[in-house]
UniProtKB/Swiss-Prot annotation:
Record field: transmembrane: 19-39, 72-92, 97-117, 137-157, 161-181, 191-211, 390-410, 412-432
Keywords: Differentiation, Endoplasmic reticulum, Golgi apparatus, Membrane, Notch signaling pathway, Spermatogenesis, Transmembrane, Transmembrane helix
InterPro entries attached to this UniProt entry: Peptidase_A22A (IPR001108), Preselin/SPP (IPR006639), Presenilin_C (IPR042524)
Keyword Membrane belongs to the record: yes
Protein's name in the database: Presenilin spe-4
Database matches in Gene3D superfamilies: Presenilin
Motif (PAL): 440-442
GO molecular function: aspartic endopeptidase activity, intramembrane cleaving; endopeptidase activity
Subunit structure of this chain's protein: Homodimer. Potential component of the gamma-secretase complex, a complex probably composed of the presenilin homodimer (sel-12, hop-1 or spe-4), nicastrin (aph-2), aph-1 and pen-2.
Superkingdom of origin organism: Eukaryota
Subcellular location: Endoplasmic reticulum membrane; Golgi apparatus, cis-Golgi network membrane
Record's GO cellular component terms: endoplasmic reticulum membrane; gamma-secretase complex; Golgi apparatus; intracellular membrane-bounded organelle
Bias (Low complexity) ranges: 326-350
Organism of origin: Caenorhabditis elegans
Length: 465
């Protein structure tokens, strides 16, 4: 009961979780619309018999389940080979090849798969033997494909709005799901789903798993690469205009964390500065005993402050190995001139409430180390525990399960499978997900969805024959 209460409270509290569930529902609904409305849940036998075994084809073992198992294993072997090839490119720093691969895959879906779907839809509406209707079909295919393709380019390859990127993620994953439903023979889909379940566990959790190793090299790539492979439910962008209070709380939390990090950094820096100044005093005393600083010396601070921003000067470049008198004298004079310069002190500030926003912005922008100002990488984005992310493959296989459930012709089974997927996803993201590690989002939803589907089918057949 405590677990259920925790799940329900997290579902109520997190707008990211609710938006992710809504996106999954939209993805499954769009897949069903195309799968049923355009293709009438029929497999493309011409394409399917080229690559798979089935009793209705010439190439078959004669056993439906054995054919499905062989097809499923073969599909995962191909997936594994592609994954390890990509892993090799990543490990050996073939960054251009990796980016080109991801880019071409995205463009193929935006222009190729979408155009094929539009062709299959409009060819059923218009008579292809009539020239006028044939030309109308071409126009209705080309124009939407160009608009959709270039819209997707803007969404995936530029700094577009997050909602636009999410829309194209949902539609692209639906197109891929329908393509798989059209290619896989009837029972092959179930074997593919269950075998890919174990593959996902290996790829994400095993030390030599492809996704595990790729994450270790994520710091070599810009965070923009994630736009091509992951769905992000960014709460700050998501709630724009709809939940301003929650957004402001998130911004305030970010400011407080930044302030805390800044205080810790300059507290450590002050200790290093004290040690440095002590060395300077010793040098002065060794060269000229009369130059030993007194209590009025600028080197002695009347009141120590936990945070103090000092301008860097050339004396910081002095080392213990420097013994030249002229260099020491130069360092002393530079230090004295530096001490007379303007110093920004924030010793009395410890929380965000004690100063205005502009003062903290200046503090953070001017005082953080250079390493904190580097461009954000994919590793930084993946390690951000405040953003909920799902891989494109998760959306694809959720919809693949729903499409296969719809092929049974039982609406009750489809709804049950969808509820099972959503329940498994909620449990995965609330109970098993942690900020320290990546949690596979495919196994539990597939298990719950499959269980709910077959259970509902069993009860449906018992009740209605």
């Amino acid at each position: 009961m405590d677990t259920l209460r925790s799940i329900s409270s997290e579902l109520v509290r997190s707008s990211q979780l609710r938006w992710t569930l809504f996106s999954v529902i939209a993805n499954m609904s769009l897949t069903l619309s195309i799968w049923i409305g355009v293709y009438n849940m029929e497999v493309n036998s011409e394409l399917s018999k080229t690559y798979f075994l089935d009793p209705s084809f010439e190439q078959t073992t004669g056993n439906l389940l054995l054919d499905g198992f062989i097809n499923g294993v073969g599909t995962i072997l191909v997936l594994g080979c592609v994954s390890f090839i990509m892993l090799a490119f990543v490990l050996f720093d073939f960054r251009r090849i990796v980016k080109a691969w991801l880019t071409l895959s995205c463009l193929l879906i935006l222009f190729g798969v979408s155009a094929q779907t539009l062709h299959d839809m409009f060819s059923q509406v218009f008579d292809q033997d009539d020239n006028n209707q044939y030309y109308m079909t071409i126009v209705l295919i080309v124009v939407p494909t160009v608009v959709y393709g270039f819209g997707g380019i803007y969404a995936f390859f530029s700094n577009s709005s997050l909602i636009l990127h999410q829309i194209f993620v949902v539609t692209n994953c639906s197109l891929i799901s329908v393509f798989y439903l059209r290619v896989f023979p009837s029972k092959t889909t179930w074997f593919v789903l269950w075998i890919v379940l174990f593959w996902d566990l290996f790829a994400v959790l095993a030390p030599m798993g492809p996704l595990k190793k790729v994450q270790e090299k994520a710091s070599d790539y810009s965070k923009c690469v994630l736009n091509l492979i992951m769905f992000s439910a960014n709460e700050k962008r998501l709630t724009a205009g709809s939940n301003q209070e929650e957004t402001n709380e998130g911004e305030e939390s970010t400011i407080r964390r930044t302030v805390k990090q800044t205080i810790e950094y300059y507290t450590k820096r002050e200790a290093q500065d004290d040690e440095f100044y002590q060395k300077i005093r010793q040098r002065r005393a060794a060269i000229n005993p009369d130059s030993v600083p007194t209590e009025h010396s600028p080197l002695v601070e009347a009141e120590p402050s936990p945070i103090e921003l000092k301008e860097k000067n050339s004396t910081e470049e002095l080392s213990d190995d420097e013994s030249d008198t002229s260099e020491t004298s130069s360092g002393s004079s530079n230090l004295s001139s530096s001490d007379s310069s303007t110093t920004v002190s924030t010793s009395d500030i410890s929380t965000a409430e004690e100063c205005d926003q502009k003062e903290w912005d200046d503090l953070v922008s001017n005082s953080l180390p250079n390493n904190d100002k580097r461009p954000a990488t994919a590793a930084d984005a993946l390690n951000d525990g405040e953003v909920l992310r799902l891989g494109f493959g998760d959306f694809v296989f959720y919809s693949l399960l729903i499409g296969q459930a719809a092929a049974s012709g039982c609406p009750f089974a489809v709804i049950s499978a969808a509820l099972g997927i959503l329940f498994g996803l909620v449990v995965t993201l609330t109970v098993f997900s942690t900020e320290e590690s990546t949690t596979p989002a495919l196994p539990l939803p597939v298990i719950c969805g499959t269980f709910c589907y077959f259970s509902s089918m069993f009860f449906w057949e018992q009740l209605y024959g």
